[in-house]
């Protein structure tokens, strides 16, 4: 009468070298897992995340980094959808790091920016990673700089960083990008 569930086999731990190999080969699943590892606040993940970042550093610095900000509702995500398709049509690869505001109470986030990038989100040479700001100031997530390193190591030659929205705290992204774009109503 009761449904018997089989225990799932425990996943083996992935090594830093395996993460880097997957990232370098353009494996987006491995890239996504590495970003999750870097964003994790668990102490047991931090040393592995640091090792992955260090091993990726030699493959960085060759991208165009663009920070995109504006008041909520100005059309940041919609503009990224259009700009991103233009980048891809010219033969580039694009990573979009979309930072969403988080609830002060739960630190959770809707992570809805990706849904507004309808055309871009289905392109094979586009990687869109929504991340909660989790209370970080500066318009970016706590580990945005490290995520940029991972995306560059994966061969993304264009990186857009969409901030939570314009305000007096939108300064941290400025030091991470080559160009800063303000979208106004």
Briefly describe each language-model feature range.
Residues 69:
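Residues at the beta-strand->loop junction immediately N-terminal to the Walker
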Residues 15-66, 74, 79-169, 174-185:
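Nucleotide-state-sensitive switch-loop elements of NTP-binding domains
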């Amino acid at each position: 009468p009761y449904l018997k569930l089989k225990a799932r086999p425990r996943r083996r731990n992935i090594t830093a070298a395996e993460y880097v190999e997957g990232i370098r080969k353009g494996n987006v699943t491995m890239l996504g897992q590495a970003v999750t590892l870097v964003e994790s606040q668990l102490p047991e993940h931090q040393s592995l995340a640091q090792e992955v970042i260090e091993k990726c550093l030699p493959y960085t610095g060759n991208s165009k980094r663009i920070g995109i900000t504006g008041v909520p509702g100005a059309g940041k995500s919609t503009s990224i959808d259009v700009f991103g398709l233009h980048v891809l049509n010219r033969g580039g690869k694009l990573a979009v790091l979309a930072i969403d505001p988080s609830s002060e109470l739960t630190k959770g986030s809707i992570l809805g920016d990706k849904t507004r990038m309808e055309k871009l989100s289905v392109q094979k040479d586009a990687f869109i990673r929504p991340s909660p700001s989790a209370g970080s100031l500066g318009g970016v997530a706590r580990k945005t700089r490290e995520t940029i390193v991972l995306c560059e190591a994966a061969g993304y030659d264009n990186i857009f960083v969409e901030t939570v929205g314009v305000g007096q705290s939108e300064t941290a992204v400025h030091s991470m990008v080559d160009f800063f774009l303000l979208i106004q109503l």
